[in-house]
């Protein structure tokens, strides 16, 4: 049976977001999804697994409130930050009428969710230094409801200037909402907009436990916003969005002791990142290394070395960013364990220009 006549045209023509797992590369060293290389251990207690969980578990919310420094009524828990990206569009954007803005090169799920929900989008590229083009944004605010800014930006790893974000918040006041995706902010907490949350009611912050907390498989994220916005999001979120095991582990992860463990992980990532950057500078295949405040590095390689293909053939999986505007021949390298970083370096140093 041909189902095509039943399918919405936008879904029929949709190109799904190519997540690291969906690409289905085979390998032994996974440095393509910005995951922590070692799984943390938490004890599971599932006595009430026969019961539906609370829609918004209070203990988990209170723990994250203590960690983030905001009031509990400013927090929504979701299945990763990805779910909040979608929920915000459902609440604020009318299909085939309203617009969102995002600024490539950046995270791909803003575009994908807009296409799924039939919401128009304007892609306003960043400047050459990957900072916001505020004048272009200001001139294209007609019918815009949401502006998604990833900070630190994925995949470039840079921080958006605080004064630019403050200026943007003032530009769009009473016009649109700024959604600041802070998935990687735990690696550079000084750059967070959290201190602006009470000052600017049009600011929304997205967070996750997938990166610094090493819980990507858990799928647990948070939206920080004005309580009125949080209440709107609870209207459209599914009745039981967070599974009981996720609530249990996430609540444990946000206790003071386990937050200390997370801080230790972050220090290890910083050390490995510095070591990897220093070693990459000695590799003849490397054309440019971009500064990073995150758990990954964006690197531009000379094309004749065929780095992505060569490393993939040896079981080392990186993330090719060449499809993004301005990132031709660029690969994103997750900061793995010390041994994984050493393996990447030793493999790159063996590559010879004359080999290809």
Swiss-Prot record:
Pfam families: Aminotran_1_2. The modification N6-(pyridoxal phosphate)lysine is found at residue 211. PROSITE patterns: AA_TRANSFER_CLASS_2. Pathway: Amino-acid biosynthesis; L-histidine biosynthesis; L-histidine from 5-phospho-alpha-D-ribose 1-diphosphate: step 7/9. It catalyses: L-histidinol phosphate + 2-oxoglutarate = 3-(imidazol-4-yl)-2-oxopropyl phosphate + L-glutamate. Its EC number is 2.6.1.9. Keywords: Amino-acid biosynthesis, Aminotransferase, Histidine biosynthesis, Pyridoxal phosphate, Transferase. GO terms for molecular function: histidinol-phosphate transaminase activity; pyridoxal phosphate binding. SUPFAM superfamilies: PLP-dependent transferases. GO terms for biological process: L-histidine biosynthetic process. Its cofactor is pyridoxal 5'-phosphate. Homodimer. Belongs to the class-II pyridoxal-phosphate-dependent aminotransferase family. Histidinol-phosphate aminotransferase subfamily. PANTHER family: HISTIDINOL-PHOSPHATE AMINOTRANSFERASE, HISTIDINOL-PHOSPHATE AMINOTRANSFERASE-RELATED. This is Histidinol-phosphate aminotransferase. It comes from Blochmanniella floridana. The gene is hisC.
